[in-house]
């Protein structure tokens, strides 16, 4: 009997862990889908962040400021998933981190862990802190030039990292409500699984 109870509890705990992992993966996917628009809007920044241009163009800086004004999290997503094969990009992280300073746009990558809902002590969060320290030591690069290269075509994949529509991003109220509902649902799911364990422990 005791062995059966232990097995049931282990199964219930495993179900909760799986549910939480799936929920976390869904949250990251939502971040990627939400920021697909911003990646396309910052297409003119690619030559700079890939190390092919000495300075960003005015169009790049304009697109960056629109992103930071509408959703600061998206710059964090780009940096976090810089090595994602779905992006098909080779991004120089140091240049990407220096971009806000070069474009005279306010951005603080040390806030990325909070924006991405990361544990401050997790390896992913520490990456942002270490990158910020390295940026403070090296300093920003040159200011944007007046010349602008031709438009760059990007074909983001579904679930791709950071950006899908036209670069002019706006906050969509319906999306915010959906995210709020999702978080509430996740909380209720955790409570439900807690009571499942409680029931097994007390009544079985």
From Swiss-Prot:
Residues 139-163 have a biased composition (Low complexity). Vascular-specific expression in leaves, roots, stems and inflorescences. Residues 139-173 are annotated as: Disordered. SMART domains: AAI. It comes from Arabidopsis thaliana (Mouse-ear cress). It comes from the Eukaryota. One of its GO terms (cellular component) is side of membrane. This is Non-specific lipid transfer protein GPI-anchored 14. Residues 164-173 have a biased composition (Polar residues).
């Amino acid at each position: 009997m005791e062995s059966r109870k232990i097995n049931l509890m282990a199964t219930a705990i495993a179900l909760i862990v799986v549910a939480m992992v799936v929920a976390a993966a869904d949250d990251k996917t939502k971040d990627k889908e939400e920021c697909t628009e911003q990646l396309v809007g910052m297409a003119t920044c690619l030559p700079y962040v890939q190390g092919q241009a000495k300075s960003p163009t005015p169009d790049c800086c304009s697109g960056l400021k629109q992103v930071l004004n509408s959703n600061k999290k998206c710059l964090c997503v780009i940096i976090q998933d810089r090595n994602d094969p779905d992006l098909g990009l080779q991004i120089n992280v140091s240049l990407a981190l220096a971009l806000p300073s070069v474009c005279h746009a306010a951005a603080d990558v040390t806030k990325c862990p909070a924006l991405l809902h990361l544990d401050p002590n997790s390896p992913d969060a520490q990456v942002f802190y270490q990158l910020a320290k390295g940026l403070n030591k090296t300093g920003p690069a040159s200011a944007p030039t007046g010349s602008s290269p031709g438009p760059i075509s990007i074909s983001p994949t579904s679930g791709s990292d950071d950006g899908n529509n036209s670069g002019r991003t706006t906050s969509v109220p319906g999306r915010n409500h959906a995210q709020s509902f999702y978080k509430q649902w996740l909380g209720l799911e955790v409570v439900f699984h807690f009571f499942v364990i409680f029931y097994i422990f007390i009544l079985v």
